[in-house]
Design a protein with these regions (language model features):
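Glycine-rich beta-strand-centered segment in the early N-terminal region that forms part
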Residues: 24-38, 53-102, 141-143
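Glycine-rich phosphate-binding loop and adjacent beta-alpha segment
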Residues: 210-213, 254-318, 354-359
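Adenosine-nucleotide cofactor-binding segment
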Residues: 174-177, 189-259
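C-terminal hydrophobic helical "lid"/dimerization subdomain
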Residues: 1-4, 190, 235, 242, ...
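N-terminal glycine-rich cofactor-binding segment
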Residues: 6-25, 42-74, 91, 111-123
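Hydrophobic/small residue at the entry helix of a nucleotide-binding pocket
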Residues: 157, 180, 188
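NAD(P)H dinucleotide-binding glycine-rich loop of Rossmann-like/cofactor-binding domains
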Residues: 96-175
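Conserved Rossmann-like nucleotide-cofactor binding loop
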Residues: 41, 180, 204
Length: 359
C-alpha cells in the first residue's frame, strides 16, 4: 500500500502529523490532486483548539484542510479527461452538495443544507494528495502563484460578501479586519469603492489596516477606526453625513453586528458573513436602527458555485493583487506552529507546502 503524510484530526481538539495515511484513490466521478499549497483557515483554528461550536460538525478521524491548489494526478471512472486533463493546475470547491434540496434546485448550491465539506466532514487538503468531485474542480491560470491559489477559498468568501450589493462609488464599512476583512478591503478598493472605513478592536489588525492603506496609497479613501474608542458609530455617521451605503459585517461579534447596522444609512445594505459564537444575538434599538431605516440585510455563506470563482479569477486577472496577504509559508511538519501563530493573530495568512515548496 502506498502511503502519504497529512494532518489528521483524531478527536475534537486533537490532531497529529501522520506519515502512514493511505494514498487516496479517486472514486467514480472524482479526481485526485497532488497538493501544491494549502492555507490555514480560522475554521481550522477552531477545530484544532476543540471549540465546542464545532461539535457535531467535524467527523474525526479526518484529514483537515479545505483551502488549496495543486495538479490533477489521477482520474476516477467516468471522468472526461478532455474536461479535466491530467496535470491541470486547479483548485476546487470543497463543498460537496446534494443537488436535490430546494436550495440546490434553485441553483443556490452554496446554501445546500446537507453539504459535506472536505477537510471537515471528509478528508481534506492538509496532505500530499486529496480527492474531490471532478465537477467541483476549478481550473487556474498557469501564471497564478500557488500562494494565491491556496487562499482562493477564503478570498471567494470575501468576493461573495463584497459584491453582494453594488460597491462602486459607494461608502463602505468593513467591521472586523481579520484575514477575510482584509480581503474584503482589497476587493472593495479594486472595484472602486468611494471610501472605506476599516473597523476593529485589535491593535495588530488596526496596524495592518493602516499599513495596507499606506502601501496602497489610499490615505484619502480609507479611514481606520478603533472600535474601542467612544462612539465609533458616530464617527462613521458624522463622516458620511448619515451613514455608509454598505456595511460588511465580518467579525461575528454582537457589538460588531450592532455597529454595522447602526452605521449604515437609511435604505442602505448590511452584508453579514461573520459567525457569532452564541446562537442568539440581540439587535439594539431594532425599530430605530433597522426597521425605520428600511435596511436590507444579506446573509452570505461560502461562495456561489461557481459564479464567485469566476468573478474572483476575473478580478485577479485584471490586476487585483492579494499575494501580500500571505505572511508565512511553512512545510506540513510545521502545521502546529502555523495554526498557533494564525490563531494568535500573529500572521494574516499561513500557507503550507505538503509536497515541499515549489521552485
Amino acid at each position: 500500500m502506498t502511503l502519504m503524510k497529512g494532518i489528521q484530526l483524531t478527536a475534537p481538539g486533537q490532531f497529529r502529523l501522520r506519515r502512514d495515511l493511505p494514498l487516496p484513490e479517486p472514486k467514480k466521478g472524482e479526481v485526485r490532486i497532488r497538493v501544491a499549497a494549502s492555507g490555514i483557515c480560522g475554521t481550522d483554528v477552531h477545530i484544532c483548539s476543540g471549540d465546542p461550536s464545532m461539535n457535531g460538525i467535524i467527523a474525526p478521524p479526518v484529514v483537515l484542510g479545505h483551502e488549496f491548489c495543486g495538479h490533477i494526478d489521477k482520474l476516477g471512472d467516468g471522468v472526461d479527461e478532455k474536461k479535466v486533463p491530467l496535470g491541470s493546475y486547479v483548485s476546487a470547491e470543497m463543498h460537496e452538495v446534494c443537488y436535490v434540496c430546494p436550495a440546490c434546485r434553485d441553483g443556490a448550491f452554496h446554501a445546500c443544507q446537507t453539504t459535506k465539506i472536505r477537510g471537515i466532514n471528509l478528508d481534506g487538503a492538509f496532505a500530499e494528495f486529496v480527492c474531490v468531485s471532478a465537477s467541483n474542480v476549478v481550473p487556474l491560470p498557469a501564471n497564478l502563484p500557488v500562494q494565491v491559489g491556496a487562499i482562493l477559498d477564503p478570498l471567494g468568501n470575501a468576493v461573495h460578501t463584497t459584491l453582494k450589493t453594488p460597491i462602486k462609488d459607494r461608502t463602505v464599512a468593513i467591521v472586523g479586519y481579520g484575514p477575510i476583512g482584509a480581503m474584503c478591503g482589497e476587493v472593495a478598493s479594486f472595484v472602486g469603492a468611494k471610501h472605506i472605513f476599516l473597523v476593529d478592536v485589535a491593535d495588530r489588525a488596526l496596524e495592518r489596516a493602516r499599513t495596507w492603506a499606506k502601501v496602497r496609497g489610499l490615505g484619502d479613501k480609507v479611514t481606520v477606526i478603533d472600535a474601542r474608542t467612544p462612539n465609533p458609530v458616530d464617527q462613521v455617521v458624522s463622516a458620511t453625513k448619515g451613514g455608509v451605503d454598505v456595511s460588511l459585517e465580518i467579525s461575528g461579534h454582537p457589538i460588531g453586528i450592532n455597529n454595522a447596522i447602526a452605521m449604515t444609512r437609511a435604505a442602505g445594505n448590511v452584508v453579514h458573513l461573520g459567525l457569532p459564537k452564541a446562537d442568539n444575538v440581540t439587535i439594539e434599538r431594532f425599530s430605530k436602527n433597522f426597521i425605520f431605516k428600511g435596511l436590507t440585510l444579506h446573509a452570505v455563506i461560502g461562495r456561489e458555485m461557481f459564479r464567485t470563482w469566476e468573478q474572483m479569477l476575473d478580478l485577479i486577472q485584471k490586476g487585483m493583487d492579494v499575494h501580500e496577504l500571505v505572511s508565512a509559508e511553512m512545510g506540513l511538519d510545521d502545521f502546529g506552529t502555523g495554526v498557533d501563530r494564525f490563531g494568535q493573530g500573529l500572521e494574516s495568512k499561513v500557507v503550507l507546502y505538503p509536497n515541499g515548496k515549489p521552485r
